[in-house]
């Protein structure tokens, strides 16, 4: 059985919800994302293909690991009922770098603001959140017997975390949004031009019909008005991604594109 067929079969068997089964396209997109995490091209992926439980996501990951398609180091991390497949070593390295050098730009998009703005005021709370998450991930890594089950961070530990900010960091974005969720979950991005960055690659699997399969590895936005302020961190992120891409041979044809959109509302 070709590796692409194993990925598709694993998704259809483990991640099914109700009677609707995964299409080959959705299965291959997920497979490419998981491979990107395993290859160190991205630190984590947020599972959103359907409403499969964390246990189902872990079963899917276990199946791929048993077939030796991905390394056994990958883990399922559950934060506030959101399932992520993470590369622990890369995630830890990214979080440590963030604490040392503030490698991610934080953009305040509170609804009360007239326009988005880069903020330094929230670094104290963000630092505390990252330090707590690092402690959890390191603790999980010390229990090898627990690698085949989802690692859940209890609600009492993360109920005050700003998940919008955190997920942007965990997914490896060079900039992330912040808003005061104690006041409102709305933001000031409506009708504000946004530059959407996408990184797309092909799965070079060698299987018939798979080598040309294109998948979006990254997709995130930054306010157009802040392009001058975020140019340095964006350039560094792009260079780092290109360098990591050149160090592997599983995926090919990396393309990083940017386009500007203006939307009547933006959900974060």
Swiss-Prot record:
It holds the Pfam family DUF4504. InterPro entries: DUF4504 (IPR027850). Belongs to the UPF0739 family. This is UPF0739 protein C1orf74 homolog. It comes from Salmo salar. The lineage of its organism: Eukaryota, Metazoa, Chordata, Craniata, Vertebrata.
